[in-house]
Amino acid sequence: QQTQVSTVLSYYERFLERFPTVLALAEATQDEVMPYWAGLGYYARARNLHRCAQVIVNEFQGQFPRSSEQLATLPGIGPSTASAIAAFCFGERSPIMDGNVKRVFTRYFGIYGHPQKRAVDQALWALARDVVAQSPVDLNMAAYTQGQMDLGSMVCTRSKPRCEDCPLQT
């Protein structure tokens, strides 16, 4: 279950008021950070965010990594999140593979087996890389990435998919 944006906004504003820069967050102690996250749950995310800030300051000279490969080295950031950040922030042509996208790809490409299985996961990533590689060079990666997530969350839903509304129908 995802936390709603409307719920997060007041926490976000308060968090940024206290930690306006990566350096400010990196220099804080974990005990200083946690109260600003209290009420949101997912406390491992707060700890990872704090550790990310420290790594960015100490290993990347305070500059946010720009490639999905570098982003994936940060605490708590896996390949899909790294690719999403790189696509949204820097336009990198790097596919994502979150739960929604996995569902779209398994249904559209007829891939059987549980997406958490290594072989299935590898096949999905390979397909995603191929799709991006075969896309026009001027593909807006942020729009493509958001569109995939939206398609999986609003049309190609886990239960009661709205196949008649799917833009991928032939």
At which residue positions do the language-model features occur?
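Catalytic cores of DNA base-excision repair glycosylases
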Residues: Q1-L168
